[in-house]
C-alpha cells in the first residue's frame, strides 16, 4: 500500500466522501482546511457560513457551475481548533446517490480543494495536537471493531485512557532520570539527590506497570481479532454439526461418512460481546488417504494457533478411544483452554455419561467437561457460556487498559527490557550514567506509542491504513 506523505503541508484544503462507498440514504462529504468555508460557499446557497456559530447545522442547496441545483444538503460547521482535525471543517450531508457524491466532490475540487488521501483527516488531527498517535490508531480500531469488547477497548483508547497511563509513566521516568543526572552534575561534591532504595521501588512499580500492559496484549489481540477456537476430535464426533449449530448456518458439510471434513473450515461469531473464530478441523484418526492425512496435519497446526480447544467426543464410541485421542491432543493443548465436549448425550444413559466423564478426567485432568447433543441442540447454550468464561475476560475491569495493537506491544517489550536493565543497575550499584541511559531508552519507547518520539516512515505507514475520508 502506498504510504501517505507525512511531510505534506497542511496549508491546502482537502475534501473526501467520509461515508462508506456505495449507494445509501445519506452520504457525508468532509472538507477541512483554512479555506473550507470559502470552498463550500462558492457552490452554497443558504445562510452565510462565514457568519454562523461553530458546531451548528444549516440547510441549503449546492449548485453546479451553471447555477443548477445539484442537491439539498445540510452543512455542519466546526471551526478550528474545536474540530476533529483542529482546522475549520464543514461536513455536507447529501443524498446518497453515487453521482451526487462524485459531482459534489468535483465541485469542491474545482473550488480549490484537493482530494484527501487515505487517513489524511486523522493525520491532521494528530499533527494539530487533537489526538496523539495511539488515539489516532484507536479511531481505526473503532471503525473496524466487530464486537462489544473490541469496541469498548477502542473507544477507551480513543478517549485517551491508554495515553494518560503512558503519560503518567513517562512523567515518573522523567523525574527519575532528572534526579540521576543531577547527581552526575554534582558528582565531585558527593551529593546524593535520590535515595537508592526509593529509586529501586519506583523502578519496580514502573516495571510492573509496563509488564502488565505488555501481558494484556494476548487477551487484547484476541478481543480485537477474535479468540481462535479449534474444534477437534475423531471423525464423525459431531464437530461440523456443532460448528453449524454455533453459526446458525450449514457452513460445514455434515455426513455419516467418517472423514467427510478433510480440511479446516473457519468462521466467526459473537458471543457475550466477544468475537470467536471457530475452526472445524479434519477428524483425528489413522488413515492411508493422502488428502485426509494432509487435513489431519493441518488440524495439529491449527491446534497450536488456537487459544481455546473444543475436543469433541462421540459418546456412542468405546470409552477406550478417549485416552488414545487425548494422547494426540494434549501435547498441543499446553497453556490453552481445553474443553472436552461429550456429544450425543441424547443417545446415552446417565451411567454412560458418568463413565465418559470419568475417562476424560483420567486422560485429561486439566480439561473442563461439557455434555451436549449438537444434533438435538441440547445444552449448546451452556457450551457457549463455557466459551465466554474460557476467554477469561468476563472479570476484566471495564476501566482497565488493554493493549490490542502489535506496534504498541513491541514498544512495551523494549521499554520493559530497558527498565529492567535500569533496575538491575540500581541494585548492583553501577554508574548512574548507565542507569540514566536505560531510563531514557524506556521513555523513548513509551513515547513511540503516543507519537511523541517517532519517525515520518512510521507515521506514513500508520495513516496509510485508513480509508479515504477518515
Describe the predicted segments one by one.
Residues 1-152, 156, 160, 332-333, ...:
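A glycine-rich (often HGG/GG-containing) alpha/beta subdomain
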Residues 2-21, 148-270, 287-289, 305, ...:
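C-terminal-of-GTPase-core extension/linker across diverse P-loop GTPases
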Residues 59-71, 75-79, 259-287, 305:
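Switch I (G2) and immediately adjacent beta-strands of P-loop GTPase domains
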Residues 278, 312, 341:
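Generic enzyme active-site microenvironment
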Residues 284, 292-296, 323:
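Short alpha-helix of the ABC ATPase nucleotide-binding domain corresponding to the H-loop/switch region
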Residues 292-316:
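Inter-motif core of Ras-like GTPase G domains
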Amino acid at each position: 500500500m502506498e504510504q501517505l506523505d507525512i511531510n505534506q503541508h497542511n496549508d491546502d484544503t482537502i475534501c473526501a466522501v467520509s461515508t462508506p462507498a456505495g449507494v445509501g440514504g445519506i452520504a457525508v462529504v468532509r472538507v477541512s482546511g483554512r479555506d473550507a468555508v470559502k470552498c463550500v460557499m462558492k457552490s452554497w446557497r443558504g445562510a452565510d457560513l462565514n457568519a454562523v456559530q461553530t458546531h451548528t447545522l444549516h440547510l441549503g442547496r449546492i449548485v453546479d457551475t451553471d447555477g443548477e441545483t445539484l442537491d439539498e444538503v445540510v452543512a455542519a460547521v466546526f471551526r478550528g481548533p474545536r474540530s476533529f482535525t483542529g482546522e475549520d471543517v464543514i461536513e455536507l450531508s447529501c443524498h446518497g446517490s453515487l453521482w451526487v457524491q462524485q459531482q459534489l466532490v468535483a465541485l469542491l475540487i474545482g473550488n480549490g480543494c484537493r482530494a484527501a488521501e487515505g487517513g489524511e483527516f486523522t493525520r491532521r488531527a494528530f499533527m494539530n495536537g487533537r489526538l496523539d498517535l495511539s488515539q489516532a490508531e484507536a479511531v481505526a480500531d473503532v471503525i473496524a471493531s466487530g464486537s462489544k469488547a473490541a469496541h469498548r477497548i477502542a473507544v477507551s483508547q480513543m478517549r485517551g485512557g491508554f495515553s494518560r497511563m503512558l503519560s503518567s509513566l513517562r512523567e515518573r521516568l522523567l523525574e527519575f532520570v532528572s534526579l540521576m543526572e543531577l547527581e552526575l552534575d554534582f558528582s565531585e561534591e558527593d551529593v546524593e539527590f535520590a535515595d537508592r532504595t526509593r529509586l529501586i521501588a519506583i523502578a519496580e512499580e514502573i516495571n510492573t506497570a509496563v509488564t502488565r500492559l505488555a501481558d494484556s496484549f494476548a487477551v487484547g489481540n484476541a478481543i480485537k481479532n477474535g479468540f481462535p477456537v479449534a474444534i477437534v476430535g475423531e471423525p464423525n464426533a459431531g464437530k461440523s454439526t456443532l460448528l453449524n449449530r454455533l453459526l446458525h448456518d450449514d457452513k460445514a458439510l455434515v455426513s455419516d461418512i467418517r472423514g467427510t471434513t478433510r480440511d479446516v473450515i473457519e468462521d466467526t461469531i459473537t458471543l457475550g460481546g466477544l468475537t470467536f473464530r471457530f475452526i472445524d478441523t479434519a477428524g483425528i484418526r489413522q488413515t492411508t488417504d493422502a488428502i485426509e492425512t494432509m487435513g489431519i496435519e493441518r488440524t495439529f497446526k491449527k491446534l497450536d494457533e488456537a487459544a481455546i480447544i473444543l475436543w469433541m467426543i462421540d459418546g456412542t464410541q468405546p470409552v477406550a478411544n478417549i485416552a488414545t485421542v487425548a494422547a494426540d491432543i494434549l501435547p498441543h493443548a499446553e497453556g490453552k483452554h481445553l474443553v472436552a465436549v461429550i456429544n450425543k448425550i441424547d443417545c446415552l444413559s446417565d451411567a454412560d455419561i458418568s463413565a465418559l466423564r470419568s475417562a476424560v478426567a483420567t486422560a485429561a485432568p486439566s480439561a473442563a467437561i461439557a455434555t451436549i447433543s449438537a444434533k438435538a441442540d441440547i445444552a449448546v447454550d451452556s457450551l457457549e457460556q463455557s466459551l465466554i468464561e474460557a476467554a477469561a475476560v468476563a472479570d476484566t475491569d471495564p476501566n482497565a487498559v488493554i493493549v490490542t495493537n502489535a506496534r504498541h506491544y513491541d514498544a512495551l517489550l523494549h521499554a520493559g527490557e530497558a527498565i529492567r536493565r535500569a533496575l538491575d543497575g540500581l541494585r548492583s550499584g553501577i554508574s548512574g550514567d548507565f542507569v540514566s541511559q536505560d531510563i531514557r531508552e524506556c521513555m523513548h519507547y513509551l513515547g513511540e506509542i503516543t507519537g511523541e518520539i517517532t519517525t515520518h516512515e512510521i507515521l506514513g505507514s500508520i495513516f496509510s491504513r485508513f480509508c479515504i475520508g477518515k
